[in-house]
Amino acid sequence: MRFTFIAAKKAEHTVTILCRCLRVTRSGFYAWQRRPESTHARDDRRLKVLVRASFEESTHRYGSPRIHEDLLEQDEHVSRKRVIRLMQEDGLVARLRKRYKLTTMSDHDQPVAANLLDRQFEAEAPNQRWVGDTTEFVIGSSGKLYLAAILDLFSRFIVGWAVSAVNDRHLTIKALEMALKRRCPEIGLLHHSDQGCTYASEDYQTILAARGITCSMSRRGNCYDNAVMEAFFSTVKHELADRFDSCGDAKMALFDYIEVFYNQRRRHSTLGQVSPAAYERRAIEEGMDAMENRTERGFPQRPHPSIFSEKEEGRTTQTT
């Protein structure tokens, strides 16, 4: 390890000084340099390239658990401890998580729904349980931009989102309309949010009722009742940013993060370290396999529900 340190620092300091500080001989260092590289060291060097590629592709968002999964997916038989060591040697550190400010405005006279979700943050199929919430970002020195998002608890897929400089019902309705257009859920969906006035508003509740969606709301002042959305916003600000130079920069960055990275590529620990889109594709494939098995055994084939569909000009296309 001392010789490795000297080799790394000899461009900054003389070998003589480094050897003297570390109490090793110059001849010993030069003899070490002349030795052929070991198989383990050569493999470490190769793996470091893959580790850094995964780290850079995630734009410095991935720590050792997800980078380890990336390597396993590439058929690299490497331990988690080795990945940690290689990252430490290369100085690769994922972005630090920050606390963020809540934006709930619950001082209103609108009716409030019961907490029907009751912290049951799992779903057996898509479009059974959605959760929604709003957070804020700092723009410039004192400006603000609000992000409203809706997440499907089955796959943690962000099905709808919207941004605005104003935190009002129009913002949350825009996110809801995106989710409804994207998913076309059947009657019976449970929609959970906090007691904020933007979700309790008559306009928002009218849309839910018209689509046969049941409303559920967290208890007042209890962020744990909507913990999955709180965690999502924390992840966004940890892996992306909590402030931007302009609204335009924020909108482009959020689109890239949510639609390109989070939904399609980001590994999720709750989903077995696969992305929301990959988890949904796997669910579709398993559902079709089960249907084929029923047909082979002589059972009648049941209609396959359009769980990830968008209706365009009378035809149904799959969306992930």
Task: Enumerate the language-model features and the residues they cover.
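Charged DNA-binding/catalytic regions of mobile-element recombinases
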Residues: 1-320
